[in-house]
Swiss-Prot record:
Signal peptide interval: 1-29
MF annotations from Gene Ontology: cell-cell adhesion mediator activity
Protein name: Endothelial cell-selective adhesion molecule
Comp. bias (Polar residues): 304-318, 335-347
Gene: Esam
Tissue: Highly expressed in the heart and lung. Weakly expressed in the kidney and skin. Expression is restricted to the vascular endothelial cells. Expressed in the kidney, heart and tongue (at protein level). Also expressed on megakaryocytes and activated platelets.
Residues covered by the Ig-like V-type domain: 37-146
Extracellular-side segments: 30-251
Membrane topology classification: Single-pass type I membrane protein
Length: 394
């Protein structure tokens, strides 16, 4: 909301502003907080300690000869993007402080300097000191605030050195060096140790990235190379050994690498093959097997029947149709009828019965193999209708 000039609200705000300005001027006149010139911006090294100097004075010393001066002190840290963080306080004679922080002197000396120990990078920021002095009646007679900016520096952490490329004669390689932590950012320098000492500069050296490029390698360039990461507060080193090889050595190394890779692949393949085979055997062992149904044994023909050469009864003719039956010799005084065409269709007269031993039926194939042997060999019997003596199918 914008207030126009001459309104009652504007007059009230003006009165309040003038009153606060007068009170602040009176407070500054009663006491003043001091920070040494040139020490409002400090730098310190991580792990060490630092003192933030500050003290206050009263304007009218003669009116404060009695010991009832009650200061209220607060130190707090302000960092970008964070809420103010209280570091130390002294209120009503009780001091509260975080670990590693303390007052350098007794507060009765009016010296409110703050000591910070075991510094970390996270301790960087703006420290504000607020002092409010009261009398024995609890009335404020002076108040002041001062700021000191602190920057914690970090020496380079031990860097890591590496070699990029295959170092054999005539090729190019790059030596890399990198520190994981440094404030401010580290600068890098490469050198080769004795007996062939050498310090490298640009353009082969990149002091910001920490890389050193070596071109057209030779045997004489072999040796120990040292990288030094350095900033304003410290340094750290690492080294790498360069062994330049001839073509034969390079071929041996390449062959060893390839052979190792091929060997690993073969071992992996054998392991997979063994696992697959074991799994297959396990599955076969776990299968439920059913007994095969025995083949049906069909009756075979008599030994007088003929069988085809392929072992099946595809064409069987009755031996009775092929050969006439054996008749008994005629007795004297008996009549032997002669069969005719018409008598074959009618029932023939009963022939005289001759007592002879019945022929033994032996089922043999033309090759001399029995029916049981054919059944074991897997032959399949085929039923073929037989012919009667009259030539009709039975």
């Amino acid at each position: 909301m914008i207030l126009q000039a001459g309104t009652p609200e504007t007059s009230l705000l003006r009165v309040l502003f003038l009153g606060l300005s007068t009170l602040a001027a009176f407070s500054r006149a009663q006491m003043e907080l001091h920070v040494p010139p040139g020490l409002n911006k400090l730098e310190a090294v991580e792990g060490e300690e630092v003192v933030l100097p500050a003290w206050y004075t009263m304007a009218r010393e003669e009116s404060w000869s009695h010991p009832r001066e009650v200061p209220i002190l607060i130190w707090f840290l302000e960092q970008e993007g964070k809420e103010p963080n209280q570091v130390l306080s002294y209120i009503n004679g009780v001091m509260t402080n975080k670990p590693g922080t303390a007052l350098v002197h007794s507060i009765s000396s009016r010296n409110v300097s703050l000591r910070l120990g075991a510094l970390q990078e996270g301790d960087s920021g703006t420290y504000r000191c607020s002092v409010n002095v009261q009398n024995d009646e609890g009335k404020s007679i002076g108040h002041s605030i001062k700021s000191i900016e602190l920057k914690v520096l970090v020496p380079p952490a031990p860097p890591s050195c590496s070699l990029q490329g295959v170092p054999y004669v005539g090729t190019n390689v790059t030596l890399n060096c990198k520190s994981p932590r440094s404030k401010p950012t580290a600068q890098y320098q490469w050198e080769r140790l004795a007996p062939s000492s050498q310090v490298f500069f640009g353009p082969a050296l990149d002091a910001v990235r920490g890389s050193l490029k070596l071109t057209n390698l030779s045997i004489a360039m072999s040796g120990v190379y040292v990288c030094k990461a350095q900033n304003r507060v410290g340094f750290a080193k690492c080294n790498v050994t360069l062994d330049v090889m001839t073509g034969s050595k390079a071929a041996v190394v390449a062959g060893a690498v390839v052979g190792t890779f091929v060997g690993l692949v073969l071992i992996a393949g054998l392991v997979l093959l063994y696992q697959r085979r074991s799994k297959t055997l396990e599955e076969l062992a776990n299968d439920i097997k059913e007994d095969a149904i025995a083949p049906r044994t069909l009756p075979w023909t008599k030994g007088s029947d003929t069988i085809s050469k392929n072992g099946t009864l595809s064409s069987v003719t009755s031996a009775r149709a092929l050969r006439p039956p054996k008749a008994a010799p005629p007795r004297p005084g008996t009549f032997t009828p002669t069969p005719s065409v018409s008598s074959q269709a009618l029932s023939s007269p009963r022939l005289p019965r001759v007592d002879e031993p019945p022929p033994q039926a032996v089922s043999l194939t033309p090759g001399g193999v029995s029916s049981s042997a054919l059944s074991r060999m897997g032959a399949v019997p085929v039923m073929v209708p037989a012919q009667s003596q009259a030539g009709s199918l039975v």
